[in-house]
A protein has these predicted regions:
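Short, low-complexity Pro/Thr/Gly
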Residues: 1-231
């Protein structure tokens, strides 16, 4: 008899503070789903955590738009939301390190994927909460960039593997997921083409975890291939 359950996995390389950022030397997040007698539902993979935006190098001030120190011109992509943080996405065998799929320029892919898969109703509704994708730049600036509280997110990881393969036998293919963070200069832009007040701005992620659904008690195939369209 098969049983479905949910797993929550913490990244392997998060420092003791629980916070990661490109600016502070943590450009790569690695999560490992080790070898186990279970079938992984790839469509259920979700990355969740908190996003903070800081206007100074010390990470103590939010860009609230009140004076030079507040970086009033600081902006980000309202069309990508939290996906702006991801520069590359890699899936590989956790033991042999054989690469299954490697997507470079992930933000460019998502900028083409999201308009096709989501409408304005989605953006104004659940995507504004789950992926921090907003209807316009002002909503993103006011609710994410200038927010004095952490912005919570929980997103899927669209890729050829997650969209094209239903179940993955973890007893034969333990999975390692590697997320390369985007540089701050790629995540932010200036609304008036001047960068004097935003040169020290950076984004920071915390409380990161990967959740997924696995099914146990199911016989995994003795042979076969992973058939999917790589992106």
């Amino acid at each position: 008899m098969s049983t479905k359950s949910y797993r929550s996995i913490l990244p392997n390389n998060v420092p003791s503070t629980g916070k990661v950022s490109f600016a502070r030397g943590n450009p790569i997040i690695t999560v490992t789903l080790g070898r186990q007698d279970a079938m992984l539902d790839l469509s259920s993979l979700r990355l969740s955590g908190n996003l903070d935006v800081w206007s100074n190098a010390a990470g103590t001030e939010h860009p609230q738009g009140a004076g030079p120190a507040r970086a009033a011109e600081l902006q980000g992509s309202h069309k990508l939301g939290i996906y702006s943080c991801i520069d590359q996405l890699v899936f590989r065998h956790a033991e042999t390190k054989q690469v299954i799929e490697h997507i470079r320029h992930y933000g460019r892919f998502m900028s083409s994927y999201m308009p096709v898969m989501a409408g304005m109703q989605d953006v104004a509704g659940h995507l504004s909460k789950s992926a921090l994708i907003m209807p316009n730049y002002q909503a993103y600036r006011d609710n994410v960039i200038r927010s004095t509280r952490s912005s919570v997110f929980c997103v899927s990881l669209p890729a050829g593997l997650t969209l094209g393969v239903d179940k993955l036998p973890l007893d034969k293919v333990p999975l390692e997921i590697e997320i390369h963070l985007a540089p701050d200069s790629q995540f932010f832009y200036s609304s008036d083409a001047t960068t004097t007040n935003i040169s020290n701005a950076f984004y920071e992620l915390s409380g990161l975890e990967l959740t997924c659904e696995v099914e146990t008690g199911v016989k995994s195939p003795d042979k076969g291939v992973l058939d999917f369209n790589s992106i």
